Amino acid sequence: MYEVGDKVVYPHHGAGTVVRKEERDEREYLTIQIIHNDMTVMIPSDSADRAGLRKVIGEETVEEVLGVLGGDGTKMPKNWNRRFKHNREKIKTGDVYELAEVVRNLAIREWEKGLSTGEKQMYTRAKKILASEFMYALDKDEDAAEAYLDELLADSAADKAVAG
């Protein structure tokens, strides 16, 4: 299913490239180089889908994700602990739309009320994961992808805070 050179996304870590396929203990493993944090991950090929591994989105999907980022915030639990768990579960799905929702909602919340330390860390990590995917999908370098996302979020969150 995945070949060396494929651009993939691994939930919790972000986008990377399959750099190697190898047999170990009678099982095939994929080695993925995650670009934004210089991490290498090995995943058994036969459980890659279960682990949430998927190919990087294309330009068409980027447009849809931008729509999510620019959309209205969705209702989140008021309790910090519940909200944190709710967002963590969304990130864990590996779904780019769920990830974009978390990023958007935390950006709006940061603009309106500020974020707790834990939520700030989650927001930063979620943005890095999304930016790493934009990097491949839009053929940008890491810094340009992060700057692009930050600019979109600042404009959108400011608009939502003013409108809300």
Question: Could you say what each language-model-derived stretch is?
Answer:
Residues 1-53:
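A positional/architectural concept
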